């Protein structure tokens, strides 16, 4: 599969406990998000990185990689009866994907070793939500570590959607809306960030029942220019 490192918009490390409960207002619109960035509550990472995400609690612990995948990876879920146009337009107007979509894939044992090594460093975040689930994030920017993760993901088969199909459909539709706007403006190249969706990729063997979900606003992906 194709899964790449990306520049993330995320809470400032020392203000994450302030930011997460306020995500409803921070992500209510592009102006609010830009205000949070100007205030230092949120930050735009200058460089691309993978993020190792771990959640632990009941019923156990799962570890995944957060990366950007071609938006087509979100297709093929269950048929969506709900109209997702309003949600898609909100994402397109926000210009940011508010949380990673959850995907599962067949991981090799080598990937466990690589991610285990990444988790030996200091974590970027370690927060426990009201449900008692602890969310930890490690940033992977070192060239050799990024290369190792990318090589393993390149060899993995295509992932499967393990998220709300309506959310995935809204992300796909938002991508189409932004592409239509770019085509109408004569600026479309095919390389725009809206052609990718940020995803949390979990090994299928670790996921039983409901897959883990990265909290909204913790790791977001800018899909259009502010």
Protein language model regions, located:
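Surface-exposed, charge/polar-rich loops and edge strands
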Residues: 1-161, 165-226
């Amino acid at each position: 599969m194709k899964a790449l490192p990306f520049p993330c918009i995320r809470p400032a490390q020392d203000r994450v406990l302030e930011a997460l409960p306020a995500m409803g207002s921070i992500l209510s619109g592009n102006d609010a998000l830009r205000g949070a960035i100007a205030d230092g509550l949120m930050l735009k990472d200058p460089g691309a990185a993978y993020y190792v995400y771990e959640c632990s609690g009941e019923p156990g612990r799962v570890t995944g990689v957060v990366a950007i995948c071609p938006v087509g990876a979100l297709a093929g879920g269950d048929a969506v009866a709900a109209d997702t146009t309003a949600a898609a337009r909100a994402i397109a107007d926000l210009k940011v994907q508010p949380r990673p979509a959850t995907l599962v894939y067949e991981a090799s044992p080598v990937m466990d070793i690589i991610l285990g090594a990444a988790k030996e460093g200091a974590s970027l975040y370690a927060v426990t939500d009201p449900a008692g689930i602890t969310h930890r994030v490690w940033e992977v920017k070192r060239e050799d570590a990024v290369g190792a993760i990318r090589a393993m993901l390149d060899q993995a088969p295509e992932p499967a959607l393990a998220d709300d199909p309506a959310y995935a459909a809204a992300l796909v539709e938002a991508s189409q809306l932004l592409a239509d706007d770019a085509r109408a403006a004569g600026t479309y190249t095919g390389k725009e960030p809206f052609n990718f969706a940020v995803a949390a990729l979990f090994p299928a063997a670790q996921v039983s029942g409901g897959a883990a979900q990265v909290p909204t606003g913790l790791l977001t992906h800018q899909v259009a220019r502010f």
